[in-house]
From Swiss-Prot:
This is Histidine biosynthesis bifunctional protein HisIE. It is an enzyme of class 3 (hydrolase). Its EC number is 3.5.4.19, 3.6.1.31. It comes from Bacillus subtilis (strain 168). Residues 1-116 are annotated as: Phosphoribosyl-AMP cyclohydrolase. One of its GO terms (biological process) is L-histidine biosynthetic process.
Length: 209
């Protein structure tokens, strides 16, 4: 990672920092850093920003507990903007929302037959951050990895039974349940779906060669 002196801060001594969930790729917030907050971020491996309204440093999650573990920092070609990849321990927004940005689906995304996987990954990440009462995903995260693994095993068994019985109606429902629980497991492990897809792409390219 670059040192502060290698970056281009603006005339106010600030640099914009886009904060992104390292696993779901969801943009969580846009904040600003000065040299001191950037250096503290490097030192503590948690996000620190500079509040323009309060004219002071602030450590994300210092009062709420919703800290952001820094997994990587990228900078743009002009070295005057940052992309901070994080693993959030809770909501990013002061309103209690997972992200400070609302999700608006475009027609192009709606037409993507696999777009639902990305959307589901985003919703699961949102549930983990916000932990809304009554949500099944909240229940799974509270119970922990053993419960999630048990559900993955159960759903895999039900997929096998449905396939063995040649019951296509049951199979599609059980397959959907299995995919959902796999995504929950990936989130619990902080493993992006993109990493799994990259393996598939690599294997496909090897077959094509």
């Amino acid at each position: 990672m670059k040192q502060a002196d290698e970056l281009r801060f603006n005339e106010d001594g600030l640099i914009p920092a886009i904060v992104q969930d390292a696993a779901s790729k969801e943009v969580l917030t846009l904040a600003y850093m000065n040299k001191e907050s950037y250096e503290k971020t490097l030192e503590t491996k948690e996000t620190w920003f500079y509040s323009r309204s309060r004219q002071a440093l602030w450590h994300k999650g210092e009062t709420s507990g919703n800290t952001q573990a820094v997994k990587g920092i990228r900078y743009d070609c002009d070295q005057d903007a940052l992309l901070v990849l994080v693993e959030p321990s809770g909501p990013a927004c002061h309103t209690g929302s997972y992200s400070c940005f609302t999700k608006e689906q475009t027609e192009e995304q709606a037409a993507d037959r696999f777009g639902i996987m990305n959307e589901l990954e985003r919703v699961i990440a949102e549930r983990q951050a916000e932990m809304p009462e009554g949500a099944y995903t909240t229940y799974l995260f509270r119970e922990g990895v053993d419960k999630i693994l048990k559900k993955v095993g159960e759903e895999a068994s039900e997929v096998i039974i449905a396939a063995k019985n040649r019951d296509h109606e049951e199979l599609k429902w059980e397959a959907a349940d299995l995919l959902y629980h796999l995504l929950v497991l990936l989130r619990e492990q902080s493993l992006p779906l993109d990493d799994v897809l990259d393996v598939l792409k690599k294997r496909h390219s090897e077959i094509e060669e």
